[in-house]
Amino acid sequence: MNTVSVVQFLAVGCAVFVLYGRGVFAAEGVKKAGQHKDAELCLGSDGLGHRLDEFWYNDDMCQRFLCFKDDEGIMYEQIANCPIAIAEGDCTLKPGTKGHYPDCSPRRRIAPLRTKKKGKFKRNAFYLPY
């Protein structure tokens, strides 16, 4: 199977659409962080104070958070989360592993290709993140 055939197969035989959770083409969002009683901490969306430039996670929602200051000293909270993936045709989704973002995000499983090797057909499949 040549490269053109593989591309045609993937384009026609297996359509995988990815819709992102926080915006159309972005899996990250930024919002102004709340002010914590300790000026060196930012108030995260979880209601707790967090140090600047350190990550914290919500493993139940598969999200990663980060507080940072801009050049004007305003604190922001960056939220990264998994896209919502929809598999169609022969494609499937493999659930993410337990743990922190991005490992907890689902992965697309592209449908197996049948390749002939020494007179036998062998099925190959591969995974893509998101």
From Swiss-Prot:
Which residue spans traverse the membrane? none
Tissue spec: Expressed by the venom gland.
| Coiled-coil intervals | none
Gene Ontology CC terms, in alphabetical order? extracellular region
GO MF annotation list: toxin activity
Note the superkingdom of the native organism. Answer: Eukaryota
- Kindly provide the PTM information from the record: Contains 3 disulfide bonds.
S-adenosyl-L-methionine keyword on record: no
Is-annotated flag, keyword Secreted?
yes
| Broad class of the protein's primary localization | secreted
User: Signal peptide location in the record?
Assistant: 1-26
Name the UniProt key words of this record, in alphabetical order: Disulfide bond, Secreted, Signal, Toxin
Q: Which cell locations does it reside in?
A: Secreted
The record's comment on protein family reads:
Belongs to the scoloptoxin-16 family.
What's the name of the protein?
Answer: U-scoloptoxin(16)-Er4a
Organism of origin is Ethmostigmus rubripes
Q: What is the lineage of its organism?
A: Eukaryota, Metazoa, Ecdysozoa, Arthropoda, Myriapoda
